[in-house]
Regions:
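Class I SAM-dependent methyltransferase Rossmann-like catalytic core
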Residues: 1-34
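Conserved SAM-binding loop
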Residues: 30, 37-133
C-alpha cells in the first residue's frame, strides 16, 4: 500500500499526481519565457526532466546543480556545488530556477535563507518546493 502511494512510475499514485501538479505550476511560471528556457535545477536529477521532456514538454536547457557528481547524465549540464553559494553564476544567468524538496535539507534556517537568496539571484523566475512538515 505504501509503495503504491509513493510509486512515481504509477500515474495513479499520489506521488505521480503531486509531481504532475508541480510540473503544471512550473509550466505556468515559465509560460511567458522564450524557448529554449534555461533552467537551473538545484538538487535535482535527470530522471525528473527526462519524464517531462518525454511527455512533450517545452524545450529546456537544463543545468543540474548537486553535491553529488554522480548525477551527471547525457543531455544535461552538471555543476557540483552547494546551493548556498552559486558564485559561479552571474545574476539572472538562468531564465528559471527549480528546486524540489531540497531546501529543507540545507543546514540551518540561515543557510536555507542563503540558498533561497542565491536561487532568486541567478533566475528571475523560481519555484522552490518543500514538503509540509
Amino acid at each position: 500500500m505504501v509503495w503504491s502511494f509513493a510509486d512515481n512510475s504509477d500515474p495513479r499514485s499520489w506521488a505521480s499526481r503531486s509531481r504532475a501538479r508541480r510540473i503544471r505550476l512550473f509550466e505556468r511560471l515559465i509560460a511567458h519565457l522564450p524557448d529554449p528556457v534555461r533552467v537551473l535545477d538545484v538538487g535535482g536529477g535527470p530522471r525528473f526532466w527526462r519524464e517531462y521532456l518525454r511527455g512533450g514538454g517545452r524545450p529546456l536547457q537544463i543545468t543540474l546543480l548537486n553535491l553529488d557528481p554522480g548525477q551527471r547524465a547525457e543531455g544535461f549540464d552538471l555543476v557540483v556545488a552547494d546551493a548556498r553559494d552559486l558564485h559561479m553564476f552571474d545574476d539572472a544567468a538562468f531564465d528559471a530556477c527549480f528546486s524540489n524538496s531540497l531546501i529543507e535539507h540545507v543546514g540551518t534556517f540561515y543557510d536555507q535563507q542563503r540558498a533561497a537568496r542565491e536561487m532568486a539571484r541567478v533566475a528571475p523566475v523560481y519555484m522552490v518546493q518543500t514538503p509540509h512538515r
